[in-house]
């Protein structure tokens, strides 16, 4: 079925705000004939504060901008070396509930890490994916008119020190991890294709078209 097809956009390294605006515009103007899209992107350093975010969880942002976001969740950090995947899906058309989508995204990351020999798991009390007690992937979604936007952020080979300036996702002392701690050769270039392959498998392997910026 044609509408089952997904457009995959590799956007490279981009500032947060223009991508966020584009994502909102796409979601606001899409209709039932609009193909779903997955955007793969890295962001320049930025803290984003989710809808549930509290100012006290931003400890000392320093020179890194803080931007309000309408995704679910609390504050997180994006920076180069972190693979962000935005999922712009018509949930009604794909017969997916919100909880099912969260589980699907978490499983995408768990499966990707398993291929690398890294044992990871989701947590019922704190969305995202963890290796031991350390968080390696953050998750934040918004649903509008039955369509999802925002998505996940997987730490690949980034500088983790900016996370010390916040309480990640509202948890004081939450330790963060990245793939390169176990796989020094990991980069977003070699992780993104695995991530994409795993999410498409969980979406029942729809046709897709890959577009580079």
Swiss-Prot record:
Entry protein name: Octanoyltransferase
Family assignment from sequence similarity: Belongs to the LipB family.
Assigned EC number: 2.3.1.181
Pfam families the record matches: LplA-B_cat
Catalytic reactions of this protein: octanoyl-[ACP] + L-lysyl-[protein] = N(6)-octanoyl-L-lysyl-[protein] + holo-[ACP] + H(+)
Site note Lowers pKa of active site Cys, residues: 135
UniProt-annotated catalytic positions: 169 (acyl-thioester intermediate)
InterPro entries, per the entry: aa-tRNA-synth_II/BPL/LPL, BPL_LPL_catalytic, Octanoyltransferase, Octanoyltransferase_CS
Keyword list, A-Z: Acyltransferase, Cytoplasm, Transferase
Entry superkingdom: Bacteria
Organism field: Shigella flexneri
């Amino acid at each position: 079925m044609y509408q089952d097809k997904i457009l995959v956009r590799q956007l490279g390294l981009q500032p947060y705000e223009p991508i966020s605006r584009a994502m909102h515009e796409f979601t606001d103007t899409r209709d039932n004939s609009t193909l779903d899209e997955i955007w793969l992107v890295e962001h320049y350093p930025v803290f984003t504060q989710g809808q549930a975010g509290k100012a006290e969880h931003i400890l000392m942002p320093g020179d890194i901008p803080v931007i309000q976001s309408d995704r679910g969740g609390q504050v997180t950090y994006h920076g180069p070396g972190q693979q962000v995947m935005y999922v712009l899906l018509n949930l009604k058309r794909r017969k997916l509930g919100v909880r099912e989508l969260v589980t699907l995204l978490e499983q995408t990351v768990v499966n990707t890490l398993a291929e690398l020999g890294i044992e990871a798991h989701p947590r019922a009390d704190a969305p995202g994916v963890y290796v031991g007690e350390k968080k390696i992937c953050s998750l934040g979604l918004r649903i509008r008119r039955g369509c999802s936007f925002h998505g996940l952020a997987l730490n690949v080979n980034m500088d983790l020190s900016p996370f010390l300036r916040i309480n990640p996702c509202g948890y004081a002392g939450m330790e963060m991890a990245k793939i390169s701690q176990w796989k020094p050769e990991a980069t977003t270039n070699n992780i993104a294709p695995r991530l994409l392959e795993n999410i498409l498998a969980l979406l029942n392997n729809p046709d897709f078209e890959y577009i580079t910026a």
